[in-house]
Amino acid sequence: MNHKKYKKIFYREIFFIVLALLFILPLAIHGFVPAGDDWKYHANRILEIACNIKRGNFFPMMYTYTFKRIGYLLGAFYPWLMLLPFSIFKNMTSNINVAIGLGYAFYIFIALNLVYHVTNKLFKNENQAILTSIVYSFSGYILTDCFKRMALGEFLAMIFLPVAVYGFYAVFFDNKKDWPYLAFGMSAIILSH
C-alpha cells in the first residue's frame, strides 16, 4: 500500500472513533446507563467477569461474586467472551456505567469497520460503504437495544450480523472462497447471545 492509501485508512479510522464516541454521548451527558429490562442481569455478569479477571480466573464458569453469591453456573451456559471488553473497562475505570459506555463505543467502532468492509466488498464503493456503516451502526434497533432495553446480547449479535449475512451471500451466490465470513459471523453471533 502506498502512503496515500494508509493516510485514507487512518482518517477513516479516526472518523469511526469519533462516531463511536458520539454514540455514547447520551451516556456521557447523563452519567448513567438507562436501567432497561436486562440492566441488572448484564451488569452482574460484567461485574462477575471483572472480579474473576482481577483474581486471575480468566474462564469463569461459576459466578460467586454476584447474583447474591449463590454459586450460579451461568458462565457454563451463557456466552461470556464478548463481555470481556466491558469487564476490562470495568477494571480500568471501576465504574460500571463508564465501562458499559466504553464497551458500547468499542463495539460500535467494530461494527462501523465490519459493515464498511463487507459493504465495500459487495459494492466496491467507499462512500457507500461509509454511509451504510453509519446508518447500520446508528440504526433505531441498535440504539433501542443499548439505551432503552439494555439488551446486550442482541446488541452484540447485531454487530456481527452483517458479516454473517455477507458470508451467506458469498457462499451461495457469489464467491465461495469467502466462506470464512460466514463462519466468523455466525460464531461471533453464537458467542454473543
Annotated model-derived regions:
Residues 1-8, 122-124, 170-180:
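Membrane-interface junctions at the ends of membrane-embedded or membrane-associated helices
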Residues 1-27:
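Start-transfer (signal-anchor) and selected internal transmembrane alpha helices
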Residues 10, 15, 22, 63, ...:
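Hydrophobic alpha-helical segments with strong N-terminal bias
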Residues 10-17, 84, 102, 130-134, ...:
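Hydrophobic alpha-helical transmembrane segments
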Residues 25-122, 126-160, 167, 188-192:
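Active-site lumenal/periplasmic loops and adjacent helix-entry segments of GT-C-fold
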Residues 162-180, 186-189:
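Membrane-interface transmembrane helices that cradle and orient dolichyl/undecaprenyl
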